[in-house]
Structures are given as structure tokens and as C-alpha cells.
Amino acid sequence: MKSVLAHPFPMNCRSMTGWVARWVLGICFVYLGLNKAWNPTDFLKAVHQYGWVDQTLFLTWIAALLPWLEVFCGFLLLVGFWVRGAAFVVFGMLVFFSGIILHRALRIHETTGIDFCEIRFDCGCGNGAVLVCRKLVENALLTALSLALVLSRKR
């Protein structure tokens, strides 16, 4: 019979990693989603600055619904329900928004000549103006965590 003292962490490394990934993503998405949901006008302005769609009604719907999708997915990750599905949606959002952040930063770099990592703008993530390189690294780490959850064997 194995002693609890011999194994202070009852979870194995894989399940502990999954637990940490769920909680990091869950907390981030609940916090940032609520921040956007409470300030939909600021989020709408930030999304409009990307210039990827001109239809105000469509952008208004995005600003109204996307934050709640983030909160919902974050909550699912925190409680451990539909983890792979929630992680897949989070993965898709991160890839899409990282792509448009990169595209906007490259446009700013080309038109102004500002060093790429010195570019700062409100990406719409709920934190105000951020340095683009820092945001892209942060998104890459969150994307890796979400992909790990999507590809995990445990359901």
C-alpha cells in the first residue's frame, strides 16, 4: 500500500499540467472577457481600429457577444467541463486575434517606421495599450496551452 506521504501530489505530471493549463486559460479568459463585457464601447472602438470589417452592426454584435463567449469558455475550463471543446474555441480565438494583431502591427511598422517591438496599441484584449511583441508572446503561450488541452487524451 502506497503512503500519501511518499507521493505528496496525488496527480501525475500530465494531469497536473492539464490542470494548470485549464486554470491559467480559464482565469485569463474569464477576467479579460468580463473586462470587455463591462466596457463594450471601449472594446468596440478597439475592434473597429483593425479595419477588417466596416459594418457597424456586425462589429456591435462582436463587441456584445465575444466577451461572453470568452467568459463562458473560461468558466468551462475552470470547472473542467467540456474542456477540449472550450480549449478548441479558445485556440481559434487566440489564433485569429493574434493574426490580426500581427497584421495591424506590421502595417504600423511599414507606415511609420517604428521598431516592431516598440509598437504599442490597444489590441482590444481588455488591458489598454500594450506592446505588440509582448502581446504576441503572451498569446503564443496561451495558444500553446489551449492546443495542449485540445490534443490531450483525457476528455
What do these predicted regions represent?
Residues 2-155:
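Membrane-interfacial helix-loop segments of redox and metal-homeostasis proteins
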